[in-house]
Amino acid sequence: MADNRRTSEYRRRDFLKKVATGGALATTGPLLRAAQEASAPTTGKPAASEAAPAKARARITYPRTFAGRGLKMIAFPLAGVGTGTISLGGRGQLRDWEIFNRPDKGNSPDYCFASIWAQAKGRRAVTRVLEARIEPPYEGESGLGANNVPGLPRLAGATFTGAYPFAQIDFHDAKLPVQVRLEAFNPLVPLDAEASGLPVAILRYALRNPGSAPAKVGLAFSLQNMVGKEGRQAIYREDAGVSGLLMSNPMIAASDPLMGTMVLGVLGAPAGTVSYLKGWKRAQWWDGALTFWDDFSADGALTRDAPALNPVGSIAVTQTLAAGAEAAVTFLIAWHFPNRTPERCGWEAAEGKGKSVVGNHYCERFKDAWAVAQYVAHELPTLEGRTRKFADAVQASSLPPAVLDAAMSNLSTLRTNTAFRTADGEFHGFEGCNDQRGCCHGSCTHVWNYEQATAFVFPTLARSIRESEFLRNVRDNGLMGFRSYLPDGLQIWEAAAADGQMGCLMKLYRDWQLSGDSDWLRRLWPNAKKALEFATIKGGWDADHDGVMEGVQHNTYDVEFYGPNPLCGVWYLGALRAGEEMARALGDEQSAGEFRHLFESGRRWIDANLFNGEYYIQKVVGRKSEEVAAGLRVGMGGADPMKPDYQMGEACLIDQLLGQYMAHVVGLGYLLDENNVRKALRSVYRYNYRADLSEHEAVQRTYALNDDGGVLVASYPSGKRPEIPFPYFAEVWTGLEYQFAAHLAFEGMYAEALNVVETARRRHDGERRNPWNEPECGHHYARAMSSWAVLVALNGFHYSAPEKRLTLAPRTRTSNLRSFWTLPSGWGTFAHSQLVAGQKAEIRATEGSLALASLALEGRGKARPAVKLGIETVSASVREEGNWRVIAFDREVSVAPDRPLVVTLRV
């Protein structure tokens, strides 16, 4: 698909930047015009939806828009990194309140909803719950029950637009005399985990009076206090820029996991516009909701509290809009729940420590939820401005919209309960989330191997995991536990995963290359070296020291592979190359030479013995139990190690070249024969890609079916499938699909890469599946953040901080690329253009900086460079290195926000 296909269908960049960040009632200029142009008219008819019939769902836009049936499954995470999350539903409702130190799908307060009251001068007032109408089914033991008042009138329809971290809902209702739109977000700033780690949901309702007469408008938000049960209370507070209800419970035990505070607030409301109820009237039946609705429906404001209060509080802002006027009301919900324990969240603990409070990092920053609200009120203009700069940079990219959509939508995983930070600031991750517990604890090495988002967007968090892996989870003999316990460092997991351990070595190399922090590498290197040498212990993966893993290899498919196979074998080759480079950088030439020898031996053997002419296969070799080193068998594979079940055999495996993919990400080049690598990728695409799965047979977990398309984990083109193959062979995982797509892109197979990404994202259309939740073993699965690697591959923007060298080689099919970059030292944008006689690169820093000694561009032959750093001319020379022209600057240059680098190369 041509890159320019993304721009014509959705012209709403204004939605990412036109709402003022100041006062709640601030005039916002042409606030809703873009929405009016792009949305359905206010007749109640839904706009065109992503949930149209399958044959019509061929294109994905960015931002992405949903309506009608496409609203059903939407749950858009609103939260910071490591804070828990609340999700915004497609109709405008808040759902899945997962802020209490564990996943909690389906959890909701009995009452949580926004309301609107509007009266045009001389007309009858209209009162509505500020959500689109509830869609079928309506069946339950009490119908839909009374919670969240499903029987109250709602708006006729809505259109949802998502470009993470911003969500926008345009509501439609012909009977409402004003137009209303919701914009919801939480600050997200690349590289700044603190600014991106705030426990708050920001809900900004934008209003416009399209009529010829003034209209009085009231907006209210009601929320039940969820801090325990008996003893809940709320107090009203006003502070600089924020008014609201601080909800707490003085009767709850200090150690209770639900002990904490919440805030329902409004930002920047002028004096006299705010009214509130600390609690609804306490009465029998549903009198509290009835009394609130009667009160608000009278005039769009709230009267004072009744003497006896129930735990539902409300806050309202009432104003008059002149004809044609626009305004915005910004609500926030903040929370503070410090008592995270391993047992409650689903993390396996060190012996006897299941109930130990490991805490939350955000709770160390703020004393309670009111402190969060105060901070946000003061800092929001800056935080939102920084967030919008990032969102604008993403949206301005000329990369295909499906690639942007996949990368940004899965970035939300870092802000769900899949990931958290303990009180000491350490970063940890489940594999995913079950409905009420984390799924598969321990920052699992073989799952987190695939994703690239953390290292590129929040590198300090990636380095936190590296420190846990190498400083606290490596045994004296080099065995790295492939899961970690909490509290971290008290106990080491008993087993190693071959792919996980080798992948961690490549990730260590990646994080060093991105940061250039050799002191940090030196601190981790002793255990890293042990972890690599562990492969060659007696009874180990490569006990005969030939660079090939023949031993018993536990891996990400939750079984042990017996004998040489490409999945673990190529990871090993990549780890050997990474080990060689790190050893050499630290002055350990002997180890570097040994690792290189093993690498050369292993690559020759794998190409000669595992490549069948089309792809790489496994040679199954049984082992006697007594020949297997301790810690290599987890017990999830076959019972007989001499005749093991659950092998891949002659499968065409989607991630058979996973280590090669990672080698491209980190700049280590080819680990295997280049032609064989490309043949294998073509074979995976030929044999495993399905445009339609209606005839696909699978008894396993089902993530794609019927007319969905997808890429199978494995196929058996030769027909030689083991009677009992490895368990997941017939499944479809987005985390593998994106990794495969990224590798296709690295190899120049652009059309195939894009088709894989588009196919995966079409499955998440809002009707069939939530576009912001790609599951595998649990919701919000970490592996799916491999979607960020597709950006990395297509951008071709590779940086080595130790060398201060940037290699720029876009892998798109256009002669001009605009995109963005993120590195530990800063982030910004870049452009690359092919000229009639040469090429041009322009690199800008939005925040931070980028130090460069040289820039490498693809091409051969003599060329003349012209280099500008801001307004300054920089001298440079050009040398050829294979297929590259390397522009060496006469001095180190630093790209900064006020100093863009422009390099023109003419031949």
Q: What do the predicted segments below correspond to?
A:
Residues D14-E37:
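N-terminal export signals
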Residues S115-A120, A125-V129, P136-G145, N209, ...:
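Aromatic-rich carbohydrate-recognition surfaces in CAZymes
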Residues L16, G44-A132, A407-N410, L414-N417:
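Beta-strand-rich N-terminal accessory domains
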Residues D435-L479, Q501, R522, P526, ...:
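Active-site core of glycosidic bond-cleaving carbohydrate-active enzymes
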Residues M1-R11, Q36:
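N-terminal secretory signal peptides
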Residues Q93-R95, N101-L182, P187-A193, A704-D707, ...:
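Non-catalytic C-terminal accessory modules of carbohydrate-active enzymes
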Residues E194-S196, R204, K278, W293, ...:
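The feature captures the catalytic groove of carbohydrate-active enzymes
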Residues Q36-I60, T65-G70, I74, Q168, ...:
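Acidic/polar, glycine-enriched structural segments that form the non-catalytic walls/loops
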